[in-house]
Amino acid sequence: MSKYDLSKCQRFSTAGEALNDEVYDKWLEQTGKRIYEGYGQSESAVICGNFMNFADAPVKPGSMGRPSPAYNVEILNPNDKPVPNGEVGELCIHVDQGHPFGLLTGYHKDISLTAEAFDGGFYHTGDNVYRDDDGYIWFVGRKDDIIKSSGYRISPFEVESILQKHPAVMECAVTGVEDAKRGQIVKATIVLVPAYKDKDKKEMEVEISTFAKENTAMYKIPRIYEFVEELPKTISGKIRRVEIREKDKGKDIEKIKQDF
């Protein structure tokens, strides 16, 4: 960041991937400016945000912010019933009270996908979130990204945020791998910072795993580590966890470990 003159920039915002606390804190420390995080989809305008100039709405780093006035949102369980604050559900938008501004009306030549997205008077985003007592919404993960292991539901973003606090981790993606005993086990695919790339990978695995054990619950700790040069991403920069899952699908766990 020291290479760039940011003194004339007044405000900064981000979207696409949830921002971890470390990035927010470093940015604030070096620029003196907050990052205003928001959330939307290709199918919509801004759905939630840490909106600027709202005196009663301070930035909560890592949150998607509060709902935009343009959308009436609900957080629903699998039976399309609202969940209480603090409980995880799918972020949905009311469409039973008139079609909201900036929201798609359907997917081109895909009746099935349109029917799936618009169901029960709601547009279903496919994103799992929870709302805190101040009305801020927090991203948990795409519905198909959530890892189910030994009866626990694990948010990839939560584990990624822990791992990225380790100085060796530049970025990472956490996914579930099929396991006969647990249903799924947690896997971390990691890009190391340049200073650590030549270190022994087994030693790095032990070091990062130890760090994870010290900072999160045992059931969330990755059991498999893969070190890569880069993560698969979309054109807009979002991590394609689905690509990692597809690569590992149907493989024996020991075979996956040997591959790395």
Residue locations for each model-derived region?
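AMP-binding/adenylate-forming catalytic core of the ANL superfamily
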Residues: V73, N79, V95, H99-P100, ...
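Adenylate-forming AMP-binding core of the ANL superfamily, especially NRPS adenylation
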Residues: A18, N50-F51, A57-K109, E116-A117
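Phosphopantetheine-dependent thiolation modules in NRPS/PKS and related acyl-activating systems
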Residues: I190, K238-F260
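Gly/Ser/Thr-rich phosphate-binding loop
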Residues: M1-P58, N72, P82
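Active-site glycine-centered loops adjacent to acidic/histidine catalytic or metal-binding residues
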Residues: G16, G40, G65, D127, ...
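Glycine-centered tight turns that cap/initiate beta-strands
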Residues: K8, G32, A70, A168-E171, ...
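Beta-strand->loop->alpha-helix junctions that form or flank phosphate-binding loops
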Residues: Y36-E43, S63-P67, T175-E178
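AMP-binding/adenylate-forming catalytic domain of the ANL superfamily
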Residues: E214-K238, K255-F260
